[in-house]
Every structure is written in structure tokens, then in C-alpha cells.
């Protein structure tokens, strides 16, 4: 479902996710000629927390994988709409939204008439698609 269900996106194993996995995610996208300045990571809040505490290098005075909400210079966005354990990297300008018609707002004075209220209902027909699946890579089951 969503970008994760789109055929053609890159994939990266998430077990023992390390700096090299992040670089590989970026490389998969760049090698497919989808590399643009607007790339970013999008992760579940749990994964962001995990990677904020995971050293990129060093253990005595470590440099962590995510610092200042960036991973290797790319922004890290957070949403809990992504499955726990998953993280995307890609060009999110390649996600397209299509709209058919306009927002249809209807006033229903009958449903709540006995209570003296008016019900307002809104309808809109939209869909979302990925224009270039190679512009994304997904790491799953990050540990």
C-alpha cells in the first residue's frame, strides 16, 4: 500500500542498519538517474529515535547517524503513517496527486433537524501515484 506497494522501487535490508545501508539507499536512487537536490528520508518515529542513538563512527566520542534531523546531509522527515521498522529515501516530488472534479460541499438540514443542527458533508475524488518508482528506495525491518 502506498509507495511501499509500488513495483519498481529500490529495496535495502534493514537488519542491523548501518551507515553503509544509508549510503546504499542513496546510491540506488542516484544510479537510476533520479538524483535531485530535493531528496529526503522519511521514517517512522521509532526508527528516527533508533538512528539518533546509533553511532555512525566511534564509540568513545561517537558521531551519530542522525544529527540535527539529517542523515548524510539529507533531511529526515517523520510520520507514523509508515510501518514501524521502515524508512524511505527518495525524491518525493515524484509522488503525484490527481483530483477529479472539485471539492463538493453539501449542506444537509434534515439529518440533525430534530436537534436544531445542520450537517455539512464534503466529498472529493483524489488518487495518488508515483511517477518514477526508481526515485525511491525502502529499507524494511530496520533493527
Predicted regions span which residues?
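Alpha-helical scaffold segments that mediate packing/assembly in large oligomeric complexes
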Residues: 1-31, 137-143
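Sequence/fold signature of self-assembling virion shell proteins
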Residues: 55-143
